[in-house]
């Protein structure tokens, strides 16, 4: 999955991916560190879909990423509501662009809730997003994390615990991030570490939920949690 950076309309992301010979790509559909996002300009969605067809990028090989501000596990009800509203906007935008996947970080309890309660809130948030985008084919894709602080998803089992509480199972999936896995303690610099990750993903989550992979280098050593 090649992460594309671009300026101007979102259709430029397709051109950027094609220029480097990517076969799949990820992108942000809005500024990743602000809550506000302008609507798509007229014609941009049609341009995006036409360029995807021209360069042979089917929807399942494009993985847009959610804002870093979104936190479905937040102990702050106001922030959770803003997060849900933002995700609904993003899911609608995905549908306008003909996309079928939307990647998010599960969130953080900020040290004020139990992990069990955080997992429940994430699943509840996903369920609300699904209900508010009824009839959409866009999946919420949960990404594994690096076990930093109170973030959820560093333990692969937590991803499955969230999925277990999601009502529309056909609209949820998982993205496996190799940098996050390395930071969480899987030493992917060795065959043994890679094998351990694969075995634990199979037993704790299940390959049937995997819809994307972020293949990233890690600046820190295994288990650095960053």
Where are these regions (language model features)?
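Gly/Pro-rich active-site loop or hairpin
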Residues: 81, 113, 152-160, 182-226
């Amino acid at each position: 999955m090649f992460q594309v950076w671009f300026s101007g309309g979102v259709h430029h992301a397709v051109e950027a991916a094609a220029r480097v010979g990517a076969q799949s790509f990820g992108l942000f559909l809005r500024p990743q560190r602000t809550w506000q996002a302008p609507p798509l300009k007229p014609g941009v969605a049609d341009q995006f879909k036409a360029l995807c067809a021209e360069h042979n990028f089917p929807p399942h090989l494009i993985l847009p990423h959610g804002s870093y501000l979104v936190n479905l596990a937040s102990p702050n009800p106001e922030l959770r509501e803003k997060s849900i509203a933002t995700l609904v906007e993003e899911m609608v935008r995905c549908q306008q662009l003909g996309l079928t996947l939307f990647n998010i970080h599960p969130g953080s309890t900020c040290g004020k809730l139990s992990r069990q309660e955080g997992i429940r809130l994430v699943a509840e948030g996903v369920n609300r997003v699904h209900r508010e985008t009824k009839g959409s084919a866009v999946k919420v894709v949960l990404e594994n994390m690096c076990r930093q602080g109170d973030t959820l998803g560093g333990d692969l089992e937590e991803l499955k615990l969230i999925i277990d509480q999601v009502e529309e199972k056909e609209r949820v999936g998982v993205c496996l991030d190799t940098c996050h896995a390395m930071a969480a303690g899987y030493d992917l610099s060795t065959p043994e570490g890679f094998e351990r990750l694969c075995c634990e993903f199979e037993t704790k989550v299940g390959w049937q939920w995997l819809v994307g992979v972020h293949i990233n280098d890690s600046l820190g050593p295994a288990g650095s949690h960053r």
